[in-house]
Amino acid sequence: MLCRSCAGWLRSLPTLRLPAPGSPPAWSSARLPALPVWAAASVSAASPGGWYEALAASAPVRTAEEVLLGAQEATGLPWWSNIILSTVALRGAVTLPLAAYQHYILAKVENLQPEIKDIAKRLNQEVAVCARQFGWSKRVARLTYLKNMRRLISELYVRDNCHPFKATVLVWVQLPMWVFISVALRNLSTGATHSDGISVQEQLAAGGTLWFPDLTAVDSTWILPVSVGVVNLLIVEIFALQKIGTSRFQMYVTNFVRAVSVLMIPVAATVPSALVLYWLCSSLMGLAQNLLLRSPGFRQLCRIPPSKSDSETPYRDLSAAFCAKFLSRKR
């Protein structure tokens, strides 16, 4: 009788919707001496049919080249301006809406946590009753609890249409776009592109500004590479500051991303300045996007549901957390 009541209670729980978590390019050596010998060799050393050569000649990379060339022809701006403008346009039109959608999903998932905790508490009590009545072992009771808990959480995600996997759409779009544009810029910088690749390479060689007049050469001052690393580290730290009670796995991931951000500095010092300029602009847009999505007004504009972790003064809180974490250690 008690077991039937337990089963009936489990079925009567509200239906929740929860988620379970072409021809190879003709490489030109006309401007390769501007790069370190080993870095240039890494581009031209790709044997016919190699993975990099296949990527460099792929349709998405060719499309990225056409977008960059089309933007340059349409605006008539120098290449350094064209790279910045194209980056801002793509990040604003593609990744910003996806980032807002990501925050929308995460806010709904966060708002479900009190209900999930309540269900977990009740389910644990019912499983304990059944375990005593039927003599279940701890292992059987635990497996029964986990199985039903996963089902109930999945139903919650379905009910509110907020499966956490939907929050990963941004990564699946942003990362490939970053790779394709990076390879496209490298093709243009080394002349490894269409029949007019050499002329585009010459335009890039004269299309820089300030301390990097030649976009096909590396930045010998290391200003651009170091800036990329610093901005990426700043993004990581801002993300880490908003996490309270992070798990060990999250700490490992955060430290890994920190290491990648630092390693990007020497890598950026060995590739054409056109790529590094794009990386820097993309990172700056990512930083601005991160800060913008903290604004209560912008979140309301995007119809992101209010959540417990929201703040009326996000920038003041961020500044205070940053000072407490880094500046207080020096005193």
Swiss-Prot record:
Keywords carried by this UniProt record: Membrane, Mitochondrion, Mitochondrion inner membrane, Transit peptide, Transmembrane, Transmembrane helix
InterPro entries registered for this protein in UniProt: YidC/ALB3/OXA1/COX18 (IPR001708), YidC/Oxa/ALB_C (IPR028055)
Top-level taxon of origin: Eukaryota
Transit peptide limits: 1-63
Topology relative to the membrane: Multi-pass membrane protein
Transmembrane segments: 165-185, 221-241, 260-280
Topological domains, Mitochondrial intermembrane: 64-164, 242-259
GO cellular component, one term: mitochondrial inner membrane
Molecular function per GO: membrane insertase activity
A GO biological process held by the record: mitochondrial cytochrome c oxidase assembly
Mitochondrial matrix side: 186-220, 281-331
Main location: mitochondrion
Cellular localization per UniProt: Mitochondrion inner membrane
Statement: the UniProt record of this protein carries the keyword Aminoacyl-tRNA synthetase: no
Quaternary structure note: Found in a complex with TMEM177, COA6, MT-CO2/COX2, COX20, SCO1 and SCO2. Interacts transiently with MT-CO2/COX2 during its maturation. Interacts with COX20 in a MT-CO2/COX2-dependent manner.
Similarity-based family: Belongs to the OXA1/ALB3/YidC family.
Task of the protein: Mitochondrial membrane insertase required for the translocation of the C-terminus of cytochrome c oxidase subunit II (MT-CO2/COX2) across the mitochondrial inner membrane. Plays a role in MT-CO2/COX2 maturation following the COX20-mediated stabilization of newly synthesized MT-CO2/COX2 protein and before the action of the metallochaperones SCO1/2. Essential for the assembly and stability of the mitochondrial respiratory chain complex IV (also known as cytochrome c oxidase).
Protein name as annotated: Cytochrome c oxidase assembly protein COX18, mitochondrial
Organism: Mus musculus (Mouse)
